[in-house]
Amino acid sequence: MGQELCAKTVQPGCSCYHCSEGGEAHSCRRSQPETTEAAFKLTDLKEASCSMTSFHPRGLQAARAQKFKSKRPRSNSDCFQEEDLRQGFQWRKSLPFGAASSYLNLEKLGEGSYATVYKGISRINGQLVALKVISMNAEEGVPFTAIREASLLKGLKHANIVLLHDIIHTKETLTFVFEYMHTDLAQYMSQHPGGLHPHNVRLFMFQLLRGLAYIHHQHVLHRDLKPQNLLISHLGELKLADFGLARAKSIPSQTYSSEVVTLWYRPPDALLGATEYSSELDIWGAGCIFIEMFQGQPLFPGVSNILEQLEKIWEVLGVPTEDTWPGVSKLPNYNPEWFPLPTPRSLHVVWNRLGRVPEAEDLASQMLKGFPRDRVSAQEALVHDYFSALPSQLYQLPDEESLFTVSGVRLKPEMCDLLASYQKGHHPAQFSKCW
């Protein structure tokens, strides 16, 4: 995360996990029943007696904030400058967690519907952090979605899930302290237009599915997968973020709202108004992101309403019938006047780069099934032949261990980086970092 991870009010189309809350209610602990939602209180979060004034430094604090403010360019490739920042910062191990005075605000990153995000540094250990500051309404208090997100994230510990370090509660604000990430997948793709290196797509996709398999095993649905909600470190670690719409799920399904997931990544069953769904909801979004990484552009963009979104999907998958999708005609938004045309098309015909990578089209087709029960699970997708080129050690990693701890696992330079290198007369071997 960094200057590249802005709120959607700052850069249209960007909704990084700190800045894009504001969905409907969502539950927070596995399969906890809806009737217990009122049981969540602010006391479930860590309370602190210190004020939040230190997040708006004045005087000496302001001078320190300016001194340690990162000057990293938009490419976010210079992680060494941040290391210099940490080495020059005098931290105090005696400072407590849960106190606003333990963190120093460096710069504002963005602002969302009810949260403002700052890049900060921990005065406890010198680590860079992201400070998500939520102002509490005098009448309504903390947005309930924030309480749910915090409660959920405190129970999810995985290398491909963004880490919540600390929670600070005062009378005026609630602050989430997250690990600092350098960028998100949307920004990474915009910095490398025309599609990503096939090797990098494979690594990113493996990490995405690994994170999904974990949360689905914990009975949690993300419900808002999109590139902006997938954070990337300077090494290339991909992490699921923005659990503002996430909620616990029952097995196999439960009645929820159909108004979930950004429109471009919303599956046809949700578009048709289905309120009973399970983990296959996230699988559709992951499949859309999978192909988008190859193609360099969204699969079904530019639509403004549900009907147009469905029409774009039907152009590829064909219009569903009771034979291909049992029960589809009973869904609220199903239109009986739709004609059973066009016929389904091969994915590689629509998105040509899929056909250039062995097994990529087969995996994508298993994720983008119209009938939700036909979609592959995240755990099944991880053992698909598409990933056979990756080291077998990846499957033995503990949940909290990164892929990049395995020898030889690293991102390759993207094509635009290689071209820029040759234009400058440099050799590709000089790439010491992932981008």
UniProtKB/Swiss-Prot annotation:
Q: Give binding positions for ATP.
A: L109, G110, E111, G112, S113, Y114, A115, T116, V117, K132
Gene3D superfamilies, from UniProt?
Phosphorylase Kinase, domain 1, Transferase(Phosphotransferase) domain 1
* Alphabetized GO MF terms: ATP binding; cyclin binding; cyclin-dependent protein serine/threonine kinase activity; metal ion binding; protein serine kinase activity; protein serine/threonine kinase activity
Residue span, Protein kinase domain: 103-387
Q: What does this protein do?
A: Serine/threonine-protein kinase that acts like an antiapoptotic protein that counters TRAIL/TNFSF10-induced apoptosis by inducing phosphorylation of BIRC5 at 'Thr-34'.
Q: What is this protein called?
A: Cyclin-dependent kinase 15
Spell out the family assignment given in the record's similarity comment.
Belongs to the protein kinase superfamily. CMGC Ser/Thr protein kinase family. CDC2/CDKX subfamily.
Catalysis performed (reactions) = L-seryl-[protein] + ATP = O-phospho-L-seryl-[protein] + ADP + H(+); L-threonyl-[protein] + ATP = O-phospho-L-threonyl-[protein] + ADP + H(+)
Q: Which organism is it from?
A: Homo sapiens (Human)
Q: What gene does the UniProt entry assign to this protein?
A: CDK15
Say which domain of life the source belongs to.
Answer: Eukaryota
Names of the cofactor(s)? Mg(2+)
What InterPro entries does UniProt report for this protein, alphabetically? CDK, CDK15_STKc, Kinase-like_dom_sf, Prot_kinase_dom, Protein_kinase_ATP_BS, Ser/Thr_kinase_AS
List the catalytic residues: D224 (proton acceptor)
Q: Which GO terms describe its cellular component?
A: cytoplasm; cytosol; nucleus
